[in-house]
Design a protein with these regions (language model features):
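The serine-hydrolase catalytic nucleophile loop
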Residues: 42-54
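Conserved alpha/beta-hydrolase
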Residues: 54-74
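Catalytic nucleophile-loop/oxyanion-hole region of alpha/beta-hydrolase
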Residues: 72-98
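Short beta-strand/loop motif that positions the catalytic acidic residue
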Residues: 194, 200-202, 206
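Catalytic histidine-centered segment of alpha/beta-hydrolase-like enzymes
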Residues: 234-246
């Protein structure tokens, strides 16, 4: 554990941006395609999936980046001022400033939604996608399923206590403005212009983000090279040993595939 803490603290770098908060990241130099990990909502770059992928890329000699969004983890900025649009720009900053050549994006939950946006915005850079419990449109869809009275109350208070099992409070506090801004980034109502290989991993016991969202993404993207992998006992975080093994093997297969294209 001490070594792990040392590793996490020792090599944090910061991407300085003149007009936006600085982003904390860890970068491993290596061959292409590189791998970039996008964490979930209220998560950070030190999660088990991120570090497992880093170790794997290190063993293979491939480039790897994990980072924190604005207002999350070690990055600058205030979480309560963040939006999906700002986090989308964070992902593009990382791709533009920190990577060279083709990249495989691995997006967890909300990171899966952002990875889809990045693939649309940077088609020349994003060579493949791996989603874990992709949460495309999920916050907006969940909000719109609330009774009208509840929606109005949230609008008046300006705050939505989004239920979660992943912290002590059992909710994430999101502003009403966050939800209205997020509506601009919804993508499941029309074809998604992404043509690269896509792998979508989802646990069928996911109590946070329904696995059917991964099926919708698979249906909407223009890419023909799409696999959906459902784990019958998988939870939302997909961080059991077998889940991690599946994730690493999926990335490994894509690296091989891209090498032969």
């Amino acid at each position: 554990l001490f070594l792990l803490v040392c590793r996490l603290k020792s090599s944090v770098s910061f991407l300085t941006r003149p007009d936006r908060p600085n982003l904390a990241y860890h970068k491993l130099k290596g061959r292409n395609p590189g791998v970039v990990f996008l964490p979930g909502l209220n998560s950070n770059m030190n999660g088990q999936k991120a570090t497992a992928l880093e170790d794997f890329c290190n063993s293979l000699g491939h480039a790897f980046i994990r980072f924190d969004y604005t207002g999350c983890g070690s990055s600058d900025g205030k979480f309560e001022e963040c939006t999906i649009g700002k986090w989308r720009k964070d992902v593009l900053s990382v791709l533009d400033e920190l990577t060279d050549g083709p990249q495989i994006l691995v997006g967890s939950s909300l990171g899966g939604w952002l990875m889809l946006h990045a693939a649309i915005a940077r088609p020349d850079k994003v060579a493949a996608l791996v989603g874990v419990a992709v949460a495309a449109d999920h916050l907006v869809t969940t909000f719109k399923k609330l009774p009208i009275e509840a929606q109005k109350e949230i609008e008046e208070k300006g705050e939505w206590k989004f239920p979660t099992k992943h912290n002590e409070e059992e909710y994430y506090s999101l502003s009403y403005d966050f939800i209205t801004e997020a509506e601009n980034h919804c993508m499941l109502n029309s074809p998604i212009p992404i043509t690269c290989p896509i792998r979508l991993i989802h646990g069928m016991k996911d109590g946070d983000v329904p696995w059917q969202i991964s099926m919708q993404v698979a249906d909407r993207v223009l890419s023909k090279d799409v696999d959906v992998i459902l784990r019958k006992t998988g939870q939302h975080r997909m961080s059991e040993k077998e889940d991690t093994k599946l994730l690493v093997n999926t990335v490994d297969d894509l690296i091989d595939k891209l090498a032969t294209l």
